[in-house]
A protein has these predicted regions:
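Bacterial extracytoplasmic/cell-wall-associated proteins, especially those involved in peptidoglycan
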Residues: 1-173
Length: 173
């Protein structure tokens, strides 16, 4: 695994330097992207959201960072969890978490170094593996209501037709 890491990152050293981040910071941010999406096409867009938020001094507010800091996570992210102070909880801390929360793949590392050029500051799961991206908090809050309502409907449907499958996160606002 270490060998593969250096195979991926050594050719990118110059780009890491140009990014204004250390390799540790690149890998840490890439780990968030790795946990946020499995969609290759979204990685550079999510990178742009996080980088845009960092530039504006906003908290990253990434659910996977909260989950990583919870000792016995039961699959249900609560408002209390969002306010727990850990070195990883980006709802509480400003900037990047203490270190990586996962082993990022090459696509996630490259997404940090070559982010999409967007004005997006927010994203929410569409409950289908992809995300809706927003430029404003107002637009984001509308999207959250839409997709969380759909997610609740899907959870109810799953309760009636099969095993419980969580298709959305617990409301965060």
């Amino acid at each position: 695994m270490v060998k593969r890491f250096f195979e991926v990152t050594n050719p990118l050293k110059e780009r890491v330097g140009e990014s204004g981040m250390t390799l540790q910071q690149v890998v840490t941010l890439a780990s968030l992207i790795e946990k946020e999406t499995a969609q290759s096409a979204e990685r550079a867009v999510i990178a742009s959201v996080f980088l845009n938020r960092l530039k504006k001094g906003m908290r990253l507010e990434s659910d996977p960072t909260v989950i990583y800091g919870i000792r016995d996570f039961n699959g249900n992210l609560t408002r209390k969890d969002l306010s727990e102070s850990t070195p990883y909880n980006t709802y509480v801390i400003k900037g990047l978490p203490f270190g990586p929360i996962a082993n990022p793949g090459e696509e996630s590392i490259k997404a940090v170094l070559y982010p999409a050029d967007t004005d997006y500051l927010y994203f929410v799961s569409k409950n289908n593996g992809s995300h809706h991206f927003s430029k404003t908090l107002r637009e984001h809050n509308r999207a959250v209501k839409i997709y969380q309502k759909k997610g609740r409907r899907n959870r109810t449907k799953n309760l009636l037709t099969g095993p419980l499958v969580y298709t959305t996160r617990k409301p965060l606002i």
